[in-house]
């Protein structure tokens, strides 16, 4: 890891309702490329004395001219709370969620079955039951 990279946190807030700490993260990296999120997570884990798996960082934007990147971070009290509150796409990036993917043919058949009915009956058709 680079020693020239500095991580600062602003607008720190403890969100007891969602069992997490949330903050704006400023990464100062003069003369260097944007710091990888994994490295930011590791440094935050060291700063807040926790493990990197409960830290979620996102929304990073590098300022014009480089040298400073700003993003958002959340540190959950436990992994269970993170799984409950984080969006599925962010969990998938961490490898904590696997989307069940139906085959293309099944999706198309379901779409065409749903075209044949109107209103609340679509829910029954969408569940996989055939209309008689």
From Swiss-Prot:
- InterPro entries in the record, alphabetically? eRP_eS24_sf, Ribosomal_eS24, Ribosomal_eS24_CS, Ribosomal_uL23/eL15/eS24_sf
Keywords from the UniProt entry: Cytoplasm, Nucleus, Ribonucleoprotein, Ribosomal protein
> Where does it live in the cell?
Cytoplasm; Nucleus, Nucleolus
Tell me the segments the record calls region Disordered: 90-132
Instruction: Give the Gene Ontology MF terms in alphabetical order.
Output: structural constituent of ribosome
Q: Where is the sequence biased in composition, kind Basic and acidic residues?
A: 90-100
Instruction: Output compositional bias ranges, type Basic residues.
Output: 101-119
- Signal peptide: which range, if any? none
Q: Looking at the record's lineage, which domain of life comes first?
A: Eukaryota
- Indicate whether Transmembrane helix appears among the record's keywords: no
Q: Enumerate the Gene Ontology biological process terms.
A: ribosomal small subunit biogenesis; translation
GO cellular component, alphabetical, reads: cytoplasm; nucleolus; ribosomal subunit; small-subunit processome
Purpose: Component of the small ribosomal subunit. The ribosome is a large ribonucleoprotein complex responsible for the synthesis of proteins in the cell. Required for processing of pre-rRNA and maturation of 40S ribosomal subunits. Part of the small subunit (SSU) processome, first precursor of the small eukaryotic ribosomal subunit.
Cross-referenced PANTHER family: 40S RIBOSOMAL PROTEIN S24
Its assembly, as annotated, is: Component of the small ribosomal subunit. Part of the small subunit (SSU) processome, composed of more than 70 proteins and the RNA chaperone small nucleolar RNA (snoRNA) U3.
Q: Which family does it belong to?
A: Belongs to the eukaryotic ribosomal protein eS24 family.
What protein name does the entry list?
Small ribosomal subunit protein eS24
Q: In the UniProt record, what gene is named as encoding this protein?
A: rps24
């Amino acid at each position: 890891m680079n020693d020239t990279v500095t991580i600062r946190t602003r607008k720190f807030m403890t969100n007891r309702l969602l069992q997490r700490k949330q903050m704006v993260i400023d990464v100062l990296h003069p003369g260097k490329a944007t710091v990888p999120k994994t490295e930011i997570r590791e440094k935050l884990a060291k700063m807040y004395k926790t493990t990197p798996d409960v830290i979620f960082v996102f929304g990073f934007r590098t300022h014009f001219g480089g040298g400073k990147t700003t993003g958002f971070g959340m540190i959950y009290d436990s992994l269970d709370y993170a799984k409950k509150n984080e969006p599925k796409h962010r969990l998938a990036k961490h490898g904590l969620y696997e989307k069940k993917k139906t085959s293309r043919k099944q999706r198309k058949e379901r779409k065409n079955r749903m075209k044949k009915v109107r209103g609340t009956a679509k829910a029954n058709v969408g569940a996989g039951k055939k209309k008689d």
